[in-house]
Amino acid sequence: MSVLTFREATLPNGLRVIAEINREAKSTALGYFVRTGSRDELAGEEGVSHFLEHMVFKGTERRSAWDVNREFDEMGAKYNAFTNEELTVFYGAVLPEFAPRLLDLLSDLMRPALREDEFETERKVILEEIALYRDRPHFVLYERAQEAYFGRHPLAKPVLGTTESIEAMTRAQMAAYHARRYVPNNMTLAFAGNLDWDEMLALAERMTRGWTRGAAPRNHPGFTPEPRRLRTPYDKASQAYAVFVAPGHAAAAEERYAARVLADVLGDPDNGRLFWRLVDPGLVETAMAYHHEYEELGTFLVYLQGDPAHEEEVSARVREELQRLEKRGVEAEELERAKLKTATSLVFAGETSLSRLFYLGMGYSYTGRYEALDTVRRWVMHLEPYHLGELLEARPFSRALEYWLVPADHG
Amino acid sequence: MHTLDNGLRVAVEPQPWNPGLSFTILVPVGATSDPEERLGAASMLETWLWKGAGPRGARAFADALDALGVRRQSGAGVEYTTFSASLLPEGFSAALELYADLLMRPHLPDDAFESVRALALQELAALEDQPPRKLLVRLRREAFASPHGQPVEGERETLERMTPEALRGEYRRRYGAGGSVLAVSGGVDPDEVLRIAEKHLGAWSGDAPSPPAVRLTVPHRFHIEQETEQVQIGLFYKDVPPGHYDFYASRLAVAVLSGGMSSRLFTEVREKRGLVYAVSASPGSVKGFGYLTAYAGTMPERAQATLEVMEEEIERLAQGVTREELDRAKVGVRADLVLSGESSRARAGALARDLFILDRARSLEEVEAEVMDVTLERLNAFLAGRPYRDPWIGSLGTVEVGP
């Protein structure tokens, strides 16, 4: 296997720069991980994080929107960006010879011009994106369940905002949000793959020299889940969609490895407990569980999709499985299988520089530490049934929110 | 590439640096070979195969794959069904033995049949909640007069009428080594792969029915009325088939049209006019035939304008592309090739598809050389001589787009 080296540095302006270097890799991936998202939006700013993510590609002092698109394509870059509740990430992968040029471009983009005419054009694109997701019931379900589960906690806010908030958004609001959140000490620049560390670090320093520090505070209010069952008819759904959301573990918590494997035992799509109780007998088309990690807390999510006629039966069976898991824990054999599958996945997660970049950047953004995929594998392979048992002692699934989105004629 | 005595073709691409391995088994069982009265059979069969094989029941079978750490994906498509697996090389022989059971010795048990049917019916119903996919399925159906237009998901009536006996008959008639493909990529030795393939799949018998010839309808418009937020728009154009002299020129033309964010469709439809969030064109092919589809989703009041810009941009290709556009398209294709070469799963999938479509596997180097070989003059001569025009046009939503 190739030799990996980890390097890290903090620039005078507070920007953290990290790299997992593999001189044999055929590509280089790099990205800015900005610790900002919908949870950091003030009243009236709903959706600004995501709208700004779009505006970042619409030009800077030095570049027009066309220049930006053209330059990415001249490098043949595979690039994109995404926004969630807590992070906004801009990334790209290129052949190693283009890495300095990609760094120059991405760094420049972090200081967007936010031109008024581009702002108006992009507002329409965002409204189209909101409309697109309204045609996708599983997304509507996720957004509503997130809102219901988190209540008054900032993680309840919709990432896309609402049609109303986007229609009312001003350029000045976006500029103020940018000034508050895109400060270097609130960002991580990460590299993975084939690169020259000294060259990249020097270039990053030069490109970001004018960036000034800021506070970028984030609220962590207390949160207590409120178990209940909710149900909404939706006129664009022909199937029934459901989630169970239960308290899990934070992105930096040691319990996260056990929590991920526990979710697999429950809801691996090929061989989890829910598969055999629900999909194998044909009650639902999809049954999955996963563990979602945030900064100070986490959630277990069970997702179901299928024939609305089976709603009661499915609901009862899921609750039965969750209770059984809480009462009896997991068996040694099923834990071994889930561990092995995770270990294999980690090998494949290491194949491409881009995939490595996500692991590296996300992990570091939350923990402030480098965690090699091999280290993750070791943690997972050392799990014993009692580690999972300890998580279950808190009876997380007894505090689950159950949310159903059903066709309008089943309401 | 190597062909076993029973007709199974095997391709191996070693990635010496890769600690993992992926393989894809492609069986030419898809919607194109579903009899008209049994639409959806290929898809149902794929689900049913997993309900026990060889000495193991369904659960023991899944457990055995898990014990090898196998990550798996499988599914039926228009022309074939694929079974893909990713795992560590030391488990390859044991995993292939399990897949040999699945393909050659499935139980296809009566008591699982009703749940297989229930899943198929739910999959079909779920299409109603995925407007873009629903439109593209219908677009294919409208454009092809041959079985290439048949829906992979089947139809309510055909799924409801299916019997275990009929589906077992489909298995016997269509699953076999002849026409099937095993492609392997990753940290493996090709000779070792061949030895293992021979050992576990060498006794697989049977031949797949040969694929039907492509026939098209006359280009026309259609509309599906549905209460959606966005109107879905789809276009279907004839294109050159894989293996054709102009194949790589056509691929570069699509890259100019819809490769990166400086491509024509993205620039004109989204960046300049803000008409959509999603707009794209993608090349497609079935054995012996190539096509181009374009897609956009937009709110009803902007649907007509969106369609007009899309059609105009696609027709404008006939006037040629610039040197800068071609250069960007080439560097984009080159980067895609290098990046896909990092992934064993992507390579195994591409090799398997090559063997099915072209009857040979292309290396990344060969594709790159062919792409780089297309000059501006050659591309523009192709575009002028074979313009993209006269498409099939479909819409789904609350308003119909029209001329």
Describe each PLM feature range:
Chain A
Residues 24, 29-93, 265-283, 296:
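M16/MPP (pitrilysin/insulinase) zinc-metallopeptidase core fold and M16-derived inactive scaffolds
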Residues 26-28, 99, 252:
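A short local loop/turn or secondary-structure capping micro-motif enriched for an aromatic residue
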Residues 225, 237-239, 244-245:
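Acidic, glycine-rich loop-and-beta core segments that form the ion-binding/anion-interacting portion
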